[in-house]
């Protein structure tokens, strides 16, 4: 499966994602928008924007920021596919502001 959400939704979903990962070892691509990236957003997004990479690391979820051009984005998608093939659990592609605009 693929789950697309804002990083605020990721924060709300942490327990469910962690539980599914530990119990079912289900591969899942997480596509997460990076609200609050580099402190450039509404104040309510800044805490999660700063904390998200460390949270992903603490949960042992491999992640990459999606590239800004087609070749880089394709390489990132291939990287994610390879991680999903080798890892029983979630993998994240983080979308910085403006990348998909």
Regions found by a protein language model. Give the residues of each.
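Active-site-proximal loop->helix
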Residues: 13-23, 39-58
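Short coil/turn connectors at secondary-structure junctions
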Residues: 1, 23-29, 59-61, 86-91
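Conserved thiamine diphosphate
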Residues: 44-79
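Fold-independent oxyanion-binding glycine-rich loops
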Residues: 5-8, 32-34, 56-59, 66-69, ...
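Thiamine diphosphate
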Residues: 1-35
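Short, well-ordered, mixed-charge alpha-helical segments that flank or form enzyme active sites
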Residues: 12, 37-41, 72-75, 100-101
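Glycine/aspartate-rich loop-and-adjacent alpha/beta segment that forms the canonical ThDP
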Residues: 11-15, 86-101
């Amino acid at each position: 499966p693929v789950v697309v959400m804002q990083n605020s939704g990721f924060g709300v979903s942490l327990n469910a994602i962690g539980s599914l990962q530990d119990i079912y070892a289900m591969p899942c691509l997480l596509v997460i928008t990076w609200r609050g990236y580099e402190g450039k957003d509404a104040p309510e997004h800044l805490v999660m924007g700063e904390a998200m990479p460390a949270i992903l690391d603490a949960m042992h979820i491999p992640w990459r920021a999606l590239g800004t051009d087609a070749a880089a984005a394709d390489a990132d998608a291939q990287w994610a596919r390879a991680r999903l093939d080798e890892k029983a659990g979630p993998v994240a592609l983080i979308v910085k502001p403006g990348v998909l605009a």
